[in-house]
């Protein structure tokens, strides 16, 4: 019986036929791979990972130091890092730049010298712009840094102790401002879009031309009767203050566009597109009136001379523009740098040579036309050239606004002159706001949006700084005291226009934008893709038909 029971147990313990407990070798390898993948991808603990994690000591067990002590240790680290390292680096660069120039020029780079004044003005303007850029208010766009640059130059000129050491000759100041004007005109010409020019209709054309022309005429009339300027100088003043500032409008519009305000009706796009054409119209009108004001002879001759300057500027700009389109050729090395150098070089040459040949109004037009025609063919590399020009502008912007501020002296200003300038500017700005409101009527905007566009078309800065001193420099080259007084009045109004309208316009845009503009709903890409996939699942035949 025991043998039979053992036989039965052995039969029960044997597996059924065709089934074995031993897995083949390749099956064991697959199991090992699966276990290794689980240990890595699914982060399941294994013996090896447990040993590794147990052997690592995390620094969380150590006592933490206060945040202030940690910041102090980082600040006093050796070698220095962070903020202290930046301060040391920038300070070394400033001292090194001065030392290099001093080693070449000698006394010119010592206090009271011309180059010393330029270097101090440059760094003070940069510092002022940085400080103003740090002033930020919630729900408001940042203050434009150009205000800090303008005030830095103004303070350097009007603080007695500093003014004795920081002196810049008029010739150097005029030349640097003219170079900055060339850079601005190149940026304006390259920024024009030929397709947008063809599509500009209706409200965009009215917004670009109407307020500028009306404000220029109003300023000319007011300055003639209130300030006693001749009609030619009145229109010079009018076109100086008639331009809107992209340096203030564009950053503010980008902030509103990111928040979705006014995007449904394209208000930010409209203002940014029309702003460029508004500036070009003001610069063109200024150059034409400048040529008429400094020409001699009869009125009919002066009118024909102004027309001749326009023709010369357009013709020279067309020739240079077509030349730069093909030279350098596309197969050359460093194509972007060569194009940027040629367009900047020809721009500076056009601005300076036009004054030399007594056609001051043709240089700006030549630069605008040249840059526009060159950019039409640079479609593939145009943005890269614009980046190089933008870097050049970053260098000359502090010089331009600092030099404009340094031209205004409190001692030479009379209270009645400032009062008349403020009155002329204020009335002209009110007329501009009303004109802008009328120009956007019958364009599909409600009353709140019309009010917003009217106030957004207020700030003035870049163009006023660029051309505000050109008339004064031209008058100084003629050596007539009366013309210099007229030029100083124009510069004073330009200075006050920047100082008053730039911060007020920026604040009004930031305050009114979120309150009066309709906010478009922002949908993420996942939501859009989800809606698209759901639509395809519901109507697959429609999507096939559309494809």
Curated annotation (Swiss-Prot):
GO cellular component, one term: sperm principal piece
Reactions catalysed: Na(+)(in) + H(+)(out) = Na(+)(out) + H(+)(in); Li(+)(out) + H(+)(in) = Li(+)(in) + H(+)(out); Li(+)(in) + Na(+)(out) = Li(+)(out) + Na(+)(in)
Subcellular location: Cell membrane; Mitochondrion membrane; Endosome membrane; Lysosome membrane
Ranges facing Extracellular side: 105-113, 162-171, 228-233, 291-300, 358-361, 412-417, 474-486
Domain of life assignment: Eukaryota
Cytoplasmic side: 1-86, 134-144, 190-200, 243-270, 325-339, 374-390, 441-461, 510-547
Residues passing through the membrane, by range: 87-104, 114-133, 145-161, 172-189, 201-227, 234-242, 271-290, 301-324, 340-357, 362-373, 391-411, 418-440, 462-473, 487-509
UniProt region (Disordered), positions on chain: 1-68, 522-547
Keywords: Antiport, Cell membrane, Cell projection, Cilium, Cytoplasmic vesicle, Endosome, Flagellum, Hydrogen ion transport, Ion transport, Lysosome, Membrane, Metal-binding, Mitochondrion, Phosphoprotein, Sodium, Sodium transport, Synapse, Transmembrane, Transmembrane helix, Transport
Membrane topology qualifier: Multi-pass membrane protein
Gene Ontology molecular functions: identical protein binding; lithium:proton antiporter activity; metal ion binding; sodium:proton antiporter activity
Biased composition (Basic and acidic residues): 23-45, 538-547
Activity regulation (record text): Allosterically inhibited by the N-terminal domain. Inhibited by phloretin.
Modification Phosphoserine, positions: 49
GO biological process assignments: clathrin-dependent endocytosis; flagellated sperm motility; lithium ion transport; positive regulation of osteoclast development; regulation of insulin secretion involved in cellular response to glucose stimulus; sodium ion homeostasis
Function: Electroneutral Na(+) Li(+)/H(+) antiporter that extrudes Na(+) or Li(+) in exchange for external protons across the membrane. Uses the proton gradient/membrane potential to extrude sodium. Contributes to the regulation of intracellular pH and sodium homeostasis. Also able to mediate Na(+)/Li(+) antiporter activity in kidney. May play a physiological role in renal tubular function and blood pressure homeostasis. Plays an important role for insulin secretion and clathrin-mediated endocytosis in beta-cells. Involved in sperm motility and fertility.
Family: Belongs to the monovalent cation:proton antiporter 1 (CPA1) transporter (TC 2.A.36) family.
More details: The subcellular localization of NHA2 remains controversial. Was initially thought to partially localize to mitochondria. It was later established that its predominant localization is in endosomes and lysosomes. In another recent study, endogenous SLC9B2 in the distal tubular cell line mpkDCT4 is detected in recycling endosomes but absent in plasma membrane. Inhibited by phloretin but not by the classical SLC9A-inhibitor amiloride.
Descriptive protein name: Sodium/hydrogen exchanger 9B2
Species name: Mus musculus
